[in-house]
């Protein structure tokens, strides 16, 4: 089942229910017993004698704040009196049917006028009522309640839990409750080792915690659909805003080289924006998925997948693009329909859109944060002998390079930026410093920016460094 994951990292808010409405506690539970979570709460209710009065009584009691205010609970309930089922409104827990001193003037007036009667009502709450956080808080030891695990990353129907060591004994219980409380989920897994620890394809070993073992997912992002086996490719739903941020930098008709494209989270949306992309990935399954995504999302005129090593692809693609036959894509925009002042429909046919694939790349994307910086030396001499393709001989500038990387997490990020610049300089054999950033006093031709993508862990930050490939690097003769 296809599902959009616009909010991919779900963090249910812990319940702030009053004590009497919280679930029963069993801190010895290790295997989920749903039947244990059942509770009867004695309340009072205002029984409405005529159904025609339900709406006005409800409005009156809402205004007087006498109605029970519990999330996810219908305050209108059935109540049986003398074998006749009537409607009643649940009253807040401080109101007692046998103590008129707890009644508000509104309740007194409704009773005096014979509109309602106030009596006892036993409210039954069960497992289905409470949130994931309510149930988990009722089974974990008290010393762990400050950090109840609630967040997860969703990819299609699969939830990926990242649990700290102290929660491992309850992992299956936590996962089963998560599955029960989220109808779009069918599978819950836990990563047992870091991404890429056992595979060069950035996959990870995992443990199935709850649900079925099917890892073939359907994922939507930026109006594109991807279908893949999550156990065989890399996908991080937390990066959806970063994918969009970068794609928004590309202009229709530009040429992009996506060096480590994965299943295409940059390439496929870019193709939909009429941007030409050569998208490469080393993972054979990722390549197959990307081929499917190209067809499925109808971007085959703009996106071409490849299955090569990233380092060799950087050098090969720059030369191959010059030799390939020109590609021209003609698109007929949809007819525009408008109404004039008299109401008549007027049709306007926009002119044809014509895009010709460029002979040089405008952007390189290197989304392999673990070691993408190590590939930068492939740009040394990448356009050696091809100076005539760029300024001042043509209007084309050298490409922007967008390289993802990890660095330590410093308080003001200055140390991180210095570290990233140092590592880029070493691989490019060209000096890059933090002063070269846009707005700085350094080399303005670099157009350097370092974007903070996300905090991966307390001591690990993900960044995207963007810079224009220096002439001294691109044209260097080895």
From Swiss-Prot:
Main location: mitochondrion
PROSITE patterns tied to this protein: SAM_MT_TRM5_TYW2
Residue numbers binding S-adenosyl-L-methionine: 243, 281-282, 309-310, 367
Gene Ontology BP term (one): mitochondrial tRNA methylation
GO MF, any single term: tRNA (guanine(37)-N1)-methyltransferase activity
Domain of life: Eukaryota
Keyword Cytoplasm: yes
Record Pfam families: TRM5-TYW2_MTfase (PF02475), TYW2_N_2 (PF25133)
Disulfide linkage: none
Listed EC numbers: 2.1.1.228
Catalysed reactions, as listed in the record: guanosine(37) in tRNA + S-adenosyl-L-methionine = N(1)-methylguanosine(37) in tRNA + S-adenosyl-L-homocysteine + H(+)
Residue ranges with Basic and acidic residues bias: 7-16
UniProt entry tagged with the keyword Acetylation: no
Chain intervals for the UniProt region annotation (Disordered): 1-22
Alphabetized UniProt keyword annotations: Cytoplasm, Methyltransferase, Mitochondrion, Nucleus, S-adenosyl-L-methionine, Transferase, tRNA processing
Cellular component terms per the entry's GO annotation: cytoplasm; mitochondrial matrix; nucleus
InterPro entries to which the protein is assigned, alphabetical: MeTrfase_TRM5/TYW2, SAM-dependent_MTases_sf, TRM5-TYW2-like_MTfase, TRM5/TYW2-like_N, tRNA_Gua_MeTrfase_euk
Subcellular location(s) of the protein: Mitochondrion matrix; Nucleus; Cytoplasm
PANTHER family listed in its UniProt record: TRNA (GUANINE(37)-N1)-METHYLTRANSFERASE, TRNA METHYLTRANSFERASE
Record's subunit section: Monomer.
Functional summary from the UniProt entry: Specifically methylates the N1 position of guanosine-37 in various cytoplasmic and mitochondrial tRNAs. Methylation is not dependent on the nature of the nucleoside 5' of the target nucleoside. This is the first step in the biosynthesis of wybutosine (yW), a modified base adjacent to the anticodon of tRNAs and required for accurate decoding.
Family, as annotated: Belongs to the class I-like SAM-binding methyltransferase superfamily. TRM5/TYW2 family.
This protein's name: tRNA (guanine(37)-N(1))-methyltransferase
Originating species: Emericella nidulans (strain FGSC A4 / ATCC 38163 / CBS 112.46 / NRRL 194 / M139)
Lineage of producing organism: Eukaryota, Fungi, Dikarya, Ascomycota, Pezizomycotina
């Amino acid at each position: 089942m296809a599902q959009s994951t616009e909010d991919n990292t779900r963090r249910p808010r812990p319940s702030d229910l009053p004590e009497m409405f919280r679930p029963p506690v069993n801190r010895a539970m290790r295997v989920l017993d749903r039947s244990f979570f059942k509770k009867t709460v004695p309340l009072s209710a205002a029984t409405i004698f005529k159904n025609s009065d339900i709406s006005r009584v409800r409005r009156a009691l809402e205004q007087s704040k006498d109605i029970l205010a519990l999330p996810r609970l219908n305050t209108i309930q059935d109540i049986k009196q003398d074998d006749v089922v009537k409607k009643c409104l649940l009253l807040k827990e401080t109101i007692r049917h046998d103590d008129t001193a707890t009644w508000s003037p509104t309740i007194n007036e409704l009773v005096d006028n014979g509109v309602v009667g106030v009596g006892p009502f036993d409210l039954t709450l069960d497992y289905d009522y409470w949130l994931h956080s309510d149930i988990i808080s009722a089974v974990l030891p008290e010393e762990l309640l400050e950090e109840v695990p609630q967040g997860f990353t969703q990819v299609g129907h699969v939830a990926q839990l990242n649990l700290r060591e102290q929660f491992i004994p309850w992992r299956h219980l936590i996962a089963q409750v998560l599955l029960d409380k989220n109808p779009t989920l069918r599978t819950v897994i836990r990563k047992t080792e870091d991404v890429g620890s056992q595979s060069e394809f950035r996959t990870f070993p995992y443990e199935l915690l709850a649900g079925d073992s099917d890892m073939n997912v359907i994922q939507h992002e930026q109006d594109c659909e991807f279908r893949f086996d999550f156990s065989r490719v890399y996908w991080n739903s937390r990066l959806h805003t970063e994918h969009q941020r970068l794609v928004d930098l590309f202009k229709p008709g530009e040429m992009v080289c996506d060096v480590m494209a994965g299943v295409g989270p940059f390439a496929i949306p870019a193709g939909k924006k009429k941007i030409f992309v050569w998208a490469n990935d080393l993972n054979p399954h990722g390549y197959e998925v990307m081929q499917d995504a190209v067809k499925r999302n109808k971007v085959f005129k703009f996106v071409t997948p490849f299955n090569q090593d990233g380092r060799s692809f950087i050098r090969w693609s720059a030369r191959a693009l010059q030799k390939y036959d020109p590609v021209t894509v003609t698109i007929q925009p949809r007819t525009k329909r408008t109404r004039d002042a008299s109401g008549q429909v007027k049709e306007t046919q926009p002119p044809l859109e014509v895009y010709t694939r460029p002979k040089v790349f405008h952007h390189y994307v290197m989304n392999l944060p673990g070691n993408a910086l190590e590939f930068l030396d492939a740009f040394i001499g990448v356009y050696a002998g091809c100076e005539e393709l760029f300024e001042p001989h043509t209007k084309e500038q050298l490409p922007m390079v967008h390289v993802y990387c990890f660095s330590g997490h410093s308080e003001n990020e200055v140390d991180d930026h210095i570290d990233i610049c140092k590592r880029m300089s070493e691989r490019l054999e060209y000096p890059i410093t933090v002063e070269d950033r846009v707005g700085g006093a350094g080399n303005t031709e670099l157009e350097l920016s370092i974007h903070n993508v996300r905090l991966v862990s307390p001591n690990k930050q993900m960044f995207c460094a963007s810079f224009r490939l220096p002439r001294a690097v691109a044209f260097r003769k080895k």
